[in-house]
Design a protein with these regions (language model features):
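Active-site beta3 strand of CheY-like receiver
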Residues: 45-50
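C-terminal output helix
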Residues: 86, 104-113
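Receiver (REC) domain active-site loop signature in two-component systems and cognate sites
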Residues: 55
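Short amphipathic alpha-helix used as the core "switch/output" element in two-component signaling
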Residues: 39, 61-72
């Protein structure tokens, strides 16, 4: 079973997406900040990490290299509300696999996973 970690400070809004992915056979863990994401990525070998770019405390862009330090081969999909290219250029430069712009469509997530 494919294991996914979804990191977003608006974790309550993810419930429908998590249920959708679980219905498709994915195991999905969630957390709401970069610090927990780093701990969870250290403890579990996820097949994919979906990471929100804008979070209070440690942003997605700050969290990304720390996760990549521990799990260099784990693909990361960045989720952003912003369509500013420079933000995604920074993320792409930090080796993200893909990015999604909010509001997130569950089918968009499914396509990115595949």
């Amino acid at each position: 079973m494919v294991k996914i970690l979804w990191v977003d400070d608006e974790v309550e809004l993810l419930k429908p997406h998590v249920l959708f992915l679980q219905g498709k056979g994915y195991a999905v863990d969630t957390c709401n900040n970069g610090y927990d994401a780093i701990d969870m990525a250290r403890a579990t070998a996820y097949d994919l990490i979906i990471l929100d770019e804008m979070m209070p405390g440690m942003t997605g862009l700050e969290t990304l290299p720390l996760i990549k330090e521990q799990r260099p081969t784990t693909p990361v999909i960045m989720v952003t509300k912003s369509e500013e290219e420079n933000i995604m250029d920074k993320a792409v430069g930090s080796k993200i696999a893909d990015y999604i712009i909010k509001p997130v469509n569950p089918n968009q997530v499914l396509l990115s996973i595949k």
